[in-house]
């Protein structure tokens, strides 16, 4: 009987070790991980605070290129319809893209803006149909100011956020987004023109937007 109990105990311990090992493997290999080493020409997804974004959350994406340029995307087109226009803020689904150059200072990536473009959708249904009611494109001849930048934290991971008073670290009181691997986007449009070609202009929705804007 003693041998039987001892044998069962060994089996139980083995099972526990296997389960814990599988959980550790999943966390390290399968689950998204915070970015600790930025690789060039790789798109990273940025989750609000320190969490990987769920399907219906707004998020940023960023890619640094070997030629000293970057592409940044803000995708706020994934929320449910009832989550737009909350408290009368007039928000609608939109996607913005930022193009520019970067400089590495003290391990941080300082961003300069050269071009910005974006689209707006009437509602969630329009997002699914890729029909927009507004498109804009702005160029910054002398380089625009990007207040936000990518910081290397004391923990050794990177995040997209706003500088504190020293300018060397991020402001923990402002919004910030951890960079994660496992991005659901692997390639950005190569230019604002290519970005615009992904969508169709909904003329009726555009007229409604202009009429509402002029009231």
Segments and roles (model prediction):
Residues 2-14, 19-99, 112-215:
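Lipid interaction determinants
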Residues 100-104, 109:
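Mid-length scaffold segments of soluble, non-membrane domains
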């Amino acid at each position: 009987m003693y041998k039987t109990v001892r044998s069962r105990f060994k089996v139980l311990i083995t099972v526990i070790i296997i389960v814990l090992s599988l959980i550790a493997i999943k966390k390290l290999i399968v689950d998204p991980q915070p970015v600790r080493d930025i690789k060039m020409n790789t798109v990273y997804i940025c989750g609000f605070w320190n969490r990987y974004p769920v399907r219906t959350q707004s998020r940023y994406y960023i890619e640094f290129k070997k030629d000293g340029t970057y592409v940044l995307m803000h995708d706020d087109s994934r929320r449910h319809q009832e989550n737009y226009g909350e408290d009368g803020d007039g928000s609608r689904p939109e996607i913005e893209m930022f193009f520019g150059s970067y400089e590495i200072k003290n391990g941080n990536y300082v961003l300069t803006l050269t071009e910005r473009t974006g689209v707006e959708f009437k509602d969630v249904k329009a997002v699914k149909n890729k029909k927009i009611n507004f498109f804009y494109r702005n160029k910054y001849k002398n380089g625009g100011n990007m207040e936000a930048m990518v910081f290397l934290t004391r923990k050794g991971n990177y995040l997209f956020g706003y500088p504190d008073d020293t300018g060397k670290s991020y402001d923990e009181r402002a919004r910030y987004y951890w960079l994660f691997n496992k991005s659901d986007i692997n390639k950005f449009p190569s230019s604002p023109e290519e970005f615009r070609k992904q969508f169709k202009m909904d003329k009726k929705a555009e007229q409604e937007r202009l009429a509402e804007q002029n009231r």
